[in-house]
Amino acid sequence: MFKIYAVSDSIGETAEQVANATAYQFGSSVKVERVPYVKTFEDVNNLISIIENPNEAMIISTIVLVDIREFLVQRCVESGIHISNVLGPCISLVSTILNKTPEYKPGAVWDMDKKYYKKIEAMEFAIRYDDSKDHSGIKHADIVLIGLSRTSKTPLSIYLANKGIKALNIPLMPEVPVPEELFEIDRKKIIGLTIDPMHLIEIRRHRVDNMMKIPTELKYANAERVLDELEFADKIMRKLKCKVIDVTKRAIEDTALIIMESVFSDRII
């Protein structure tokens, strides 16, 4: 099996993301292995030594340290291993355009700066107010997600938190009063999540099956119940006059991008 080694002088997430995106185009015939913290010549030699068949492997590197990066390229050439350096050409191009020498800081994405702590704070916020009955966080949230159960509210909250955005989610259910705080904040912050009824029924039935619920609890995935819930949610969203996004078969990343462009259209995240 062909293997892509995602190599970095930091934790390797960027290299792994590029490697996974590449491997995805070829199905199960390509495997990805992350190799983080390659910071010395010895680390490079150890990496090269574990690649048994150069014809069935390649390296995707985000190593920033110039001497290590160049040594890795040299060893790959000597060993007949294909290598693609992701950051090198980008850094060189920007350096040329700006006529400025780069700082070559490994792991710059994870630098312990204000953005990092903002991300941690947002993660804690999302966890604290996930499907919570405590509505005190609504006025402090950057984004408030509202929608039925299984419309990706929680994954979206966590994804947005990873961008440093405080996201809070409110489940909509006919039996539960809508928080008054929703009517007291800027409606631009509120995002309604809707979904195709048949798709929602399918998702809920799958969840019920996985949780081995007894038949008396199948109301959750009942078609009539789902339609009633969707009608209720639609009524609330129209009353709030908030932006509504259809999440049917939409990736979390795509939905999050739409949300950020809508809420933060006047500033950069």
UniProtKB/Swiss-Prot annotation:
Keyword annotations of the record: Kinase, Nucleotide-binding, Serine/threonine-protein kinase, Transferase
Protein name: Putative pyruvate, phosphate dikinase regulatory protein
Cited PANTHER family: PYRUVATE, PHOSPHATE DIKINASE REGULATORY PROTEIN 1, CHLOROPLASTIC
Function: Bifunctional serine/threonine kinase and phosphorylase involved in the regulation of the pyruvate, phosphate dikinase (PPDK) by catalyzing its phosphorylation/dephosphorylation.
Domain of life assignment: Bacteria
Keyword Chloroplast: no
Organism in which the protein naturally occurs: Clostridium botulinum (strain 657 / Type Ba4)
Family: Belongs to the pyruvate, phosphate/water dikinase regulatory protein family. PDRP subfamily.
UniProt xrefs under HAMAP family: PDRP (MF_00921)
Coiled coil: none
Enzyme class: transferase
Single GO term (MF): protein serine/threonine kinase activity
Binding of ADP, residues: G147, L148, S149, R150, T151, S152, K153, T154
UniProt xrefs under Pfam families: Kinase-PPPase
Catalyzed chemical reaction(s): N(tele)-phospho-L-histidyl/L-threonyl-[pyruvate, phosphate dikinase] + ADP = N(tele)-phospho-L-histidyl/O-phospho-L-threonyl-[pyruvate, phosphate dikinase] + AMP + H(+); N(tele)-phospho-L-histidyl/O-phospho-L-threonyl-[pyruvate, phosphate dikinase] + phosphate + H(+) = N(tele)-phospho-L-histidyl/L-threonyl-[pyruvate, phosphate dikinase] + diphosphate
EC number: 2.7.11.32, 2.7.4.27
InterPro entries xrefs: Kinase-pyrophosphorylase, PPDK_reg
